[in-house]
From Swiss-Prot:
Subunit-structure text: In the presence of PdxT, forms a dodecamer of heterodimers.
Taxonomic lineage of the native organism: Archaea, Methanobacteriati, Methanobacteriota, Thermococci, Thermococcales
Entry annotation: catalytic residues: K87
GO annotation (BP), single: pyridoxal phosphate biosynthetic process
Gene: pdxS
Keyword Lyase (UniProt): yes
Residues engaged in binding D-ribose 5-phosphate: D30, G159, G257, G278, S279
Transmembrane domains' residue ranges: none
Natural source organism: Pyrococcus furiosus (strain ATCC 43587 / DSM 3638 / JCM 8422 / Vc1)
Protein name per the record: Pyridoxal 5'-phosphate synthase subunit PdxS
Binding site for D-glyceraldehyde 3-phosphate: R171
EC nos: 4.3.3.6
Keywords: Lyase, Pyridoxal phosphate, Schiff base
CDD domains: pdxS
Length: 335
């Protein structure tokens, strides 16, 4: 890669991360039409996520969940002045190109939609629009950041109104970061090698089909022209940055199962930079009141008296689901 290209890429990444920082400390709400988008904006959302169905309805409908119709996204973009995000299927570069051309402010490469690629996520550095991606653990987060994600969010278990998986993912990432901070650089390089292993799946599958040993050559490209060693080196640099910062080097939001002001406050108390709310707003009995309350909870997460007050007269939250009852675990999608 020539020097000018490296400089341009770093500049683009800085701009992408800068946009993500603009929504830090706020609430991003899933919406399916212009009316919902306006409710979200009036409640104080920092951005909206345009979908054809909220995650609870996607889960109920089954079948293949895809990018929202262009007309629906445009309708939402025309209705509000705050940033509009939209989801694409994991690995579906064509959907992402369409959204980039449409002018959305950020793309969510999301496990809520049916994955398109069983081996890889999109190489997000090829795009000028910033991406947000989900992560259950530090390995997933570091891989997505290396690929170019400007924002990370927990996966949680979308559409359930159950916060347990989001809590699990926050704890796993935070504890792994504390472990990294106690490790030597040599030990961290070993972690980078482990975190890079999912990129080998396609190469190993092809070699197994061909009756060859499951190993790759030093100069053998395995993902977007990168060799295994180049990927390891890239992940290693991010891990060293995490060791220095004591946190992810990008904005980190909670998502998946946030259904009440208390849920939102819990996520902020655990160190999150903000909150995505999917089904929790428009599957509640009083969406405008719930939306306002969750925004206030994020702003006042460390003030119990305020939280108690804003939790009054907000109606019933969405009906939740026990994780053990789920037929589909969306959080397990992706690598």
């Amino acid at each position: 890669m020539d020097k000018m290209k490296i400089i341009m890429e770093k500049g683009t990444e800085r701009l992408k991360r800068g946009f993500a920082k603009m929504v830090k400390g706020g609430v991003i709400m899933d919406v399916t039409n212009a009316e919902q988008a306006r409710i979200a904006e009036e409640a104080g959302a920092v951005a909206v996520m345009a979908l054809h169905k909220v995650p609870a309805d996607i889960r109920k409908a089954g079948g293949v969940a895809r990018m929202a119709p262009v007309e629906k996204i445009q309708e939402i973009m025309d209705a509000v002045t705050i940033p509009v995000m939209a989801k694409v299927r994991i690995g579906h570069e064509a959907e992402a190109r369409i959204l980039e051309a449409l002018g959305v402010d950020m793309i969510d490469e999301s496990e809520v939609l049916t994955p398109a690629d069983p081996f890889f996520h999109i190489y997000k550095k090829k795009f000028t629009v910033p991406f947000v991606c989900g992560a259950r653990n530090l390995g997933e987060a570091v891989r997505r950041i290396w690929e170019g994600a400007a924002m990370i969010r927990t996966k949680g278990e979308a559409g359930t109104g159950n916060i347990i998986e989001a809590v699990r993912h926050v704890r796993l990432v935070n504890e792994n970061i504390r472990l990294i901070q106690r490790m030597t650089d040599e030990e961290i390089y070993g972690v980078a090698e482990k975190f890079a292993e999912p990129y080998l799946r396609l190469a190993f599958s092809v070699k197994e089909i061909s009756g060859l040993p499951k190993r790759v050559l030093e100069n053998e490209p395995i993902y977007e022209g990168f060799t295994y060693r180049e990927i390891v080196d890239g992940l290693y640099k991010i891990l060293l940055e995490i060791k220095k910062l004591g946190r992810l080097p990008v904005v980190n939001f909670a998502a998946g199962g946030v259904a009440t002001p208390a849920d939102a406050a819990l996520m902020m108390a655990m160190g999150m930079d903000g909150v995505f709310v999917g089904s929790g707003i428009f599957k509640s009995s009083n969406p405008p009141a719930m939306a306002r309350a969750i925004v206030e909870a994020v702003n006042h997460w460390d003030e119990p008296d305020v939280l108690a007050e804003i939790s009054r007269e907000i109606g019933e939250p969405m009906r939740g689901q026990d994780i053990a009852e789920l037929e589909v675990r969306m959080e397990e999608r992706g690598v």
